[in-house]
Amino acid sequence: MGPGDLVLEIGPGRGALTHMLARRVDVLVGVEVDPELAARLRRELADLPHVHIVHADILSCDIGQIVLERARGAQGLRRFMVVANLPYCITTPVLHKLLSASPLFEAFTLMIQLEVAQKLTATAGSVGYGELSLMAQYYTRPEILFTVGPTSFAPPPSVQSAVVRMTVSKSPCAGDLDPGELFAIVRAGFAKRRKNIRNSLVSSALFGGDHDLVAAVLGSAGIDGRLRAEQLGLDEFARLARAAVALGAVHAVDRKSGGESGDVD
């Protein structure tokens, strides 16, 4: 990260990373939910006009609006990036929100729980593979850069952490599909992990017990209904989604390009 970059830092806290980033990038936007910490950072960085500390909850604010408003007037910006040391308790919802807003960004660099990092990079048939893996790999190319032990923190957590880089894919491999259509099928497939894909789809709200429709979708997609969802890769789920759309089982739903609106100070 350097000149020409806008960086969104989620949860800057006491500002250890914030102060370092402020010296390197052209625009820095920190979103902090704690009002006292946000006010403290504003005071400490008041002489740096390119640094913007926003008091808001990242889960309820509009990420795109926050970033684009702070980018206005800046010259020569080439890339928008995200940096965060995410609290374990909100890692998954923040990831979902970032992935939905991914077209705005070049990459995310995140410190997260190692178990979650392994889910992001998991492949079909491996431990931890699921909906989050598919979302991450549809929108980005995730990779684990390095692990961080508990002794690096005070107080030390009971789990390992990892730093991951998620480079945004500008041309998703299933780009012909609306993401809502694709992930409606993914969610239906993983709703009953212990069942095979046929039974999981049949029992989902999406298909409402329609055995014939599920059989038609599986047949059209060329998917063996005896397989489980965790055995199917992104390409197989994309084939299922295309078949479901063609047969009228799935419509354009759950379209998301950013976040929901929320209070920002």
For the regions a language model picked out, list residue spans one by one:
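Catalytic cores of RNA-modifying enzymes
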Residues: 1-188, 219, 230, 239, ...
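General structural signal for alpha-helix termini and helix-helix connectors
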Residues: 169-172, 203, 223-224
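Short, glycine/charged-rich beta-strand-loop motifs at protein surfaces that mediate ligand recognition
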Residues: 184-188, 200-205
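RNA substrate-recognition surfaces in RNA-acting enzymes
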Residues: 207-245
